[in-house]
A protein has these predicted regions:
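Histidine-acidic metal/acid-base catalytic patches
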Residues: 2-139
Length: 139
C-alpha cells in the first residue's frame, strides 16, 4: 500500500509566475497529467492556495544576517500562505487529483483553524451546503 499526499500550496510555491487561482489549478493539473498512471498514487491532498510569486521575486537572494524568529516566521508565512481557494479552481483541482482524503490546510491569523476560511473553501469546491463530494477534515 503506497500513497502520496499532494500539498497544493507548497506545489504552487514552486512557480512564482502564478498570479491567479486558475493559474494554480492549471499548473497542478498539468503536473498530475504528466504523471500518467502514477497520478493515482495521490491518495491525499492538503488543499490551500498560495500565490506568493510577487513576494518571492521581491526577496533578496542573500538573507539578512540578523534575522530574529519573528522575521523568519513572517517570511515563511508570506511564502506559504495557507489561504482558502475562493473560486472554481478548487473544484478543478479536487476533480483532477481525486484524493481519497482531503485536508483543508487553512490557518487563521494566530495559527488556529479558521472556520470562516474553511466555509469559503468548501463553497469553492461545491461541498458546502450543496451536497457535494464527501470531505474529510483533519485538525
Amino acid at each position: 500500500n503506497v500513497g502520496l499526499v499532494l500539498d497544493t500550496g507548497h506545489f504552487m510555491n514552486t512557480n512564482p509566475d502564478l498570479e491567479t487561482e486558475a493559474d494554480g489549478a492549471e499548473y497542478i493539473c498539468a503536473m498530475a497529467e504528466k504523471l500518467g498512471s502514477m497520478k493515482k498514487l495521490f491518495r491525499g491532498m492538503h488543499l490551500s492556495c498560495s500565490l506568493s510569486g510577487k513576494y518571492q521575486k521581491s526577496c533578496a537572494a542573500v538573507p539578512p544576517e540578523n534575522m530574529d524568529g519573528e522575521t523568519v516566521m513572517m517570511h515563511i508565512t508570506s511564502i506559504d500562505q495557507h489561504r482558502p481557494f475562493t473560486t472554481e479552481a478548487a473544484r478543478k483541482i479536487v476533480e483532477c487529483i481525486e484524493p481519497a482524503y482531503l485536508t483543508h490546510e487553512l490557518f487563521g491569523d494566530y495559527g488556529e483553524i479558521s472556520e470562516e476560511k474553511l466555509k469559503i473553501q468548501l463553497a469553492a469546491i461545491g461541498a458546502y451546503g450543496s451536497g457535494g463530494k464527501s470531505v474529510f477534515l483533519c485538525g
